[in-house]
Each structure stands twice: as structure tokens, then as C-alpha cells.
């Protein structure tokens, strides 16, 4: 069943992480959110930066390193989702999105705080589009920097999610600067464990 983790003081309602499991895919309560979350997933990320939804559901069912979390707010209900991979000594945030009508209400910041409490002292890594790609990409990098992340690798090529596509040039951002060898190992782990091999 879904497990719940909330961060923050009692006076500040923060976003909770509710992990989806194989059972939740068939549970009416959580199943009712799936169409909205699927639409958010497919609208928030370009085709080249997301796996097919059926593959995502399969990963949820496997209960391995992949964690799909509903983001729940005590007053607003489900506000988005985040997907995390947990490896031996770091976490990787694959996808993170807030529902469009709830953006700019500090829910993303609250979610990052909750994630940091959930993962403890292990570093967290994200892929982001280069700021040269668009104004939105630049704002996203600034947003993560304001929340304690920094670009640690600029010459990273995200492997393709789909057989017919090429890799996507992205940056790697992290909650810790880290040694170069460690960052290279993180990138190799992503290539080996996260992305499909065609």
C-alpha cells in the first residue's frame, strides 16, 4: 500500500510523498488520480524526455529502485508527482511536476524540502535542459539553484527513451557538488540502470 511521508512543522502544511505500489494501481482511491497524473506527465515533459506510460506503470509494479510518489497537500489534495530512483549511495529525480493551476504557490519548494528529509544525507541528482534551450529552461535552473542545487555536469547526453530517437543534451544538477569521479559514476549508473537499451 501507499506509504506516506510528510515534512515540516505543524504550522506549515507541506507536501507529503505518497509512494504508489503495485496494489495502488488497482486501488480505487489512487487509481482515480492516474488519468490526471498521466496527462500532467505527458504535457510537462516532451516525448524525448519521458518513457511510455505503460513502462512507468510496470516500474511502479516492480517495487525496485524506482519510486513513484503522489504529491499530496493537506488542503489541496494531490498536487503533482515526483519519480525517484534510489541507488546505493544517491537518489536520482527522474520526473517532477506540479499541476499547472497550482504552480507558483511554493509547492515545488515544499516538495524539494520533503524529498530532502525523505532521502536524508544522500545526494540528489536531476537532469535539466540547458538554459540556452529556452527561457523556461533558464528559469528552471535558477529555481533549483535557489533551492540549493547546482549544475555539476554540462556535457551529459541523456540516452533516448524511444528506439527511433537520439540522445538529448542535458545538464546534471545536484544537492552536493561531489567529486568528479563520483559524478561520472552517477551518470554511468543512469545510463546503465534508468534508460532502456535498444
Question: Where are each of the predicted segments found?
Answer:
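Short amphipathic alpha-helix that is part of the acyltransferase structural core
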Residues: 12-55, 72, 170, 184-198
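Conserved beta-strand in the GNAT
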Residues: 70, 76-85, 90-97
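Conserved GNAT acetyl-CoA-binding A-motif
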Residues: 119-135
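C-terminal "cap" of GNAT-fold acetyltransferases
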Residues: 136-137, 157-198
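Conserved acetyl-CoA-binding loop-helix of GNAT-fold acetyltransferases
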Residues: 98, 104-118
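Short amphipathic, helix-prone segments within low-complexity/disordered or flexible regions
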Residues: 2-7, 15
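A short helix-loop-beta-strand connector motif used in the catalytic cores of GNAT acetyltransferases and
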Residues: 60-70, 166
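Conserved active-site alpha-helix within GNAT-family acetyltransferase domains
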Residues: 130-154
Amino acid at each position: 500500500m501507499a506509504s506516506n511521508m510528510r515534512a515540516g512543522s505543524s504550522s506549515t502544511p507541506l507536501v507529503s510523498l505518497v509512494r504508489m505500489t503495485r496494489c495502488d494501481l488497482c486501488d480505487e482511491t489512487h487509481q482515480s488520480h492516474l488519468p490526471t497524473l498521466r496527462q500532467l506527465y505527458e504535457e510537462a515533459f516532451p516525448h524525448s524526455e519521458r518513457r511510455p506510460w505503460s513502462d512507468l506503470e510496470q516500474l511502479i509494479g516492480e517495487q525496485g529502485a524506482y519510486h513513484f510518489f503522489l504529491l499530496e497537500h493537506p488542503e489541496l489534495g494531490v498536487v503533482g508527482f515526483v519519480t525517484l530512483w534510489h541507488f546505493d549511495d544517491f537518489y536520482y529525480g527522474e520526473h517532477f511536476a506540479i499541476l499547472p493551476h497550482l504552480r507558483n504557490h511554493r509547492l515545488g519548494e515544499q516538495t524539494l524540502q520533503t524529498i530532502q528529509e525523505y532521502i536524508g544525507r544522500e545526494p540528489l541528482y536531476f537532469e535539466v535542459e540547458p538554459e540556452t534551450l529556452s527561457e523556461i529552461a533558464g528559469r528552471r535552473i535558477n529555481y533549483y539553484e535557489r533551492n540549493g542545487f547546482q549544475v555539476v555536469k554540462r556535457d551529459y547526453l541523456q540516452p533516448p527513451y524511444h528506439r527511433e530517437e537520439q540522445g538529448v543534451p542535458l545538464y546534471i544538477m545536484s544537492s552536493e557538488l561531489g567529486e568528479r569521479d563520483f559524478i561520472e559514476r552517477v551518470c554511468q549508473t543512469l545510463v546503465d540502470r534508468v534508460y532502456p537499451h535498444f
